[in-house]
Amino acid sequence: MVDVNRFKSMQITLASPNKVRSWSYGEVKKPETINYRTLKPEREGLFDEVIFGPTKDWECACGKYKRIRYKGIVCDRCGVEVTRAKVRRERMGHIELKAPVSHIWYFKGIPSRMGLTLDMSPRALEEVIYFAAYVVIDPKETPLEAKSLLTEREYREKLQEYGSGSFIAKMGAEAIQDLLKRVDLDAEIAELKEELKTASGQKRVKAIRRLDVLDAFQKSGNKPEWMVLNILPVIPPDLRPMLQLDGGRFATSDLNDLYRRVINRNNRLARLLELNAPGIIVQNEKRMLQEAVDALIDNGRRGRPITGPGSRPLKSLSQMLKGKQGRFRQNLLGKRVDFSGRSVIAVGPTLKMYQCGVPREMAIELFKPFVMREIVDRDIVQNVKAAKRLIERGDDRIWDILEEVIKEHPVLLNRAPTLHRLGIQAFEPVLIDGKALRLHPLACEAYNADFDGDQMAIHVPLSEEAQAEARLLMLAAEHILNPKDGKPVVTPSQDMVLGNYYLTMEGADREGEGMVFKDRDEAVMAYRNGYVHLHSRVGIAVDSMPNKPWTDEQRHKIMITTVGKILFNDIMPADLPYLQEPNNANLTDKTPDKYFLAPGSNIQEAIKNLDLNIPFKKKNLGNIIAEIFKRFRTTETSAFLDRLKDLGYYHSTLAGLTVGIADIPVIDNKQEIIDAAHHRVEEISKAFRRGLMTDDDRYEAVTATWRDAKEQLEARLVETQDAKNPIVMMMDSGARGNISNFSQLAGMRGLMAAPNGRIMELPILSNFREGLSVLEMFFSTHGARKGMTDTALKTADSGYLTRRLVDVAQDVIIREDDCGTDRGLTITAITDGKEVTETLEERLVGRYTKKSVRHPETGEIIASPDTLITEDMAHYIAEAGVSEVTIRSVFTCNTRHGVCRHCYGINLATGDAVEVGEAVGTIAAQSIGEPGTQLTMRTFHTGGVASNADITQGLPRIQEIFEARNPKGEAVITEVKGQVTDIEEDAATRTKKVYVKGATGEGEYTVPFTARMKVQVGDEVHRGAPLTEGSIQPKHLLEVRDTLSVETYLLAEVQKVYRSQGVEIGDKHVEVMVRQMLRKVRVMDPGDTGLLPGILMDIADFTDANRDIVIAGGIPATSRPVLMGITKASLETNSFLSAASFQETTRVLTDAAIRGKKDHLLGLKENVIIGKIIPAGTGMARYRNLEPLAVNEIEVIEDSEEQEDTVEE
């Protein structure tokens, strides 16, 4: 067997007739499948054992030779070789076609490869192949033209005119085959190259396309006549099986039907030829044979598809590969696996961060082989069969063994949809009763799971390596940070937040205020016995907490705090300052001095002078986690998270916060606000009736009035709310709900959207406490339904976007330490108008500098070149007032097929420098695709009629950017650097003209009358600067400026969309994607390189070709960069396996076969498809041959080998 992991590359070419014969084990001559009485395959039929091998292992057809000892013998009676039945999956047969047949992929594909080779139109080809016209093959002495078409009648007339044999004309695929044999590739290519020197327009395009195909034939060694089949391969029978159903009927693969049609027609044709039948009958039979082969290869591509029972189109060879159910996506890229299960999930609040609860019944089934081996090893039973019976009976002894087996054996939990890599994590199983999997509450956010009936799948990693990977790389406790932005993904939520919020509240004049305690135990005891409240401010001796980082003057004093805060600080790591206030100064620096008193001072007085602190909210807890992670890394953080969770749950239970209808406050002046709004609306209507405003203006004013009324109510709510109100506490802490939920309960529901998306002028004045009228209720339903449908559509759209992103970037892997590039990317803060969408500080963290960074005032060097910028350095640089920094960037990286460590920076998921072998492309795609569901679907109206187009936002805008489409509401950009000299308004054509004059020339730009201008007369503009508001068309920008400015523009645009929706994504992820869109160049002038003009090439390949020519002293080629959308970029990848498994499978494979393409297996997808270890992480070549060293463990290793032998028996 071929060892897949030794593969260097994989090539696909056209098969020559001899090649097909060499694959074949015999000719299939009869359309029969199996004999329905004996159920044995028929001789010379589609399932023949002589051709394809025995149906039973080590047994010939007639039963003369049975058992493995006759291995390799061919039976003298039935002619079947004694071997494994598995060969029926690999042995092929063939059918000798009695007439040549054209291959539909090459004749019908777009562009038609046959047509380009012969320089004939696909229509002409169709007429010839399907016997509607003759084609002149060799005119000899006659004035006919070669390749011209003749109808039946013209053909007869010409024969009479010139005499028979004076010229050769044929019809059908054999005519095409003759023409293809006559193509002289070298001469045609030379001729086309000459033509290209002068041709232009449509002619040039056609010449380039022909040249491309002919060149492909010449370079690959494929012969054009192989596009016509003389011999048809028959795929192995086990890949097109026949199964007996229980009713004695048979279910069979459609391919057998299609093959039977071909064989029947072929045999009939053979008989007709033997009988010397009339030409027209033979012709008709040949046409039917052609159609049968077409249907077998690609049913439905031409004409109506051949249908089976129930008029269902039969599934041909092409359909077996295509689409989600095809071979690529169904069986090669994703397989169902053994040792897996699924169940509903329930919450496991008592679990540790690295644990999950697995029901006993499930665990015994999943770990069955391990338990069986252990049972045999302990001599409870003698053999594996008995052990299996023991388990199936449910013997009591198996449970103790199961407990031992699962110890230290991690399992993987996965929740669909797996939008990013945190959708599969490893846990240590803990056996539980019941039938639901138990999930740690903090792991929910990464999975986006809740406990309303979600299900999860569980998988068992079997090999030692898989277990090690699960334990070291995938354990849930390691996944503290989100790969998309480097922020903690395991922030506490709901009850955990509420409990800690309640715990850290402070109250004035609660029982026990002003008491002083000698240490924490005394304080807690007083609280437990009811002498002091959690929220009372009390004193405690600082000396009783010697481990905390106090300053020298704080040490021997008394600190004012609350019992709740003492408990809250108990769970913090010792090196963290004592937390009194929810702010960063207290967290990173020290506890503020105002809380400390000299012993003997009046503590009551001091408490009166201190303001009450606000409690710790969800956001503050997130900051604490981030700080702890920064200082102590994963192990300590995950332990801390468990303590935080337990504390939160405990105290939210004790607090007993409940919600009743009386907790919803009543706003005293609601009626006044609403009356005022009604009055204002009445005035607007009057103004409209008098013709003082347009209908659009009236609509805007009315909706604005009601919005304003709602905001006033909201503001009043916030003013009057009571901090101890449970609903307010939930909202304020970030546990659940926000101000808009609150204002719908207590204020008014406000304006609603109509089914068409337009906002209705009639607001809902009631709130949920008062209750809605029937009409109001009816209005609300529109919005609710729209919300549901939007979500459903958005999920599908977002999933498809992720799929395209993954496909285009899957081969981007960290391949080396440093690429040694001499370019860098100069970055500034990203702004949108006046607003800053992403600060320079955020963009700098975790990147390497390219040039040194100097302090703008003192000139000191803050960071020298090639330094990794930490959070503190980035903060310092921003504080110093540096406005731009040149950094190493993915855009400027020179590594082939990937990125180097220095250009990428830190791995956001770990906070450390990225490792060689990290699959950063896939992570980037997931980071951009996963938040896609949070983006909005709609295109916003920019208030009123001021703009000429609606600005696209949200998901549609992201798709527009990544697919490099022409944006809606396109901005006009200048192609000249210089000054705006004049802006003229032309009322007749309703346009404005903008004049720009510069040193190199001047430009005149026409913009629509309604467009908002971005420039005024006298402004200095650079090339590619927008003159009007709107989105720039990136392809246009690429023509005017360079690649880097397009990349920078696309990066900024993507960030604007995500940041406006409050989603943070690291720049580097967007950089990886954008770089993939610009990795190709189009060759303009080939120079001496021998490249073809007009073809697309990878930048790296183009540079290589040029380098070789320059060394040899020739003229290098010139090219221009090309911006491709992600779908196009995926299909243009160098790997045909990856492209074929993405979309347009047949087109990709047709093209690859003609070119004789080699797939060098550089990406992840191609390797998954052929079952090779992926070239990321430890699968990279540089790590491939590492041998584990045994250190004083020789005995153990020998021991384990013996144990393995017992399992195999």
Swiss-Prot record:
One GO cellular component term of this record is: DNA-directed RNA polymerase complex
Supply the InterPro entries for this chain: DNA-dir_RpoC_beta_prime, DNA-dir_RpoC_beta_prime_bact, RNA_pol_asu, RNA_pol_N, RNA_pol_Rpb1_1, RNA_pol_Rpb1_3, RNA_pol_Rpb1_3_sf, RNA_pol_Rpb1_4
Its UniProt entry gives the catalysed reaction(s) as: RNA(n) + a ribonucleoside 5'-triphosphate = RNA(n+1) + diphosphate
Give EC number(s), comma-separated. Answer: 2.7.7.6
Keywords, ordered alphabetically = DNA-directed RNA polymerase, Magnesium, Metal-binding, Nucleotidyltransferase, Transcription, Transferase, Zinc
What is the protein name for this chain?
DNA-directed RNA polymerase subunit beta'
Residue positions binding Zn(2+) 1? C60, C62, C75, C78
- Gene name of this polypeptide: rpoC
Protein function: DNA-dependent RNA polymerase catalyzes the transcription of DNA into RNA using the four ribonucleoside triphosphates as substrates.
Q: Where does Zn(2+) 2 bind?
A: C819, C893, C900, C903
In which residues is Mg(2+) bound?
D450, D452, D454
What terms describe the molecular function in GO for this protein? DNA binding; DNA-directed RNA polymerase activity; magnesium ion binding; zinc ion binding
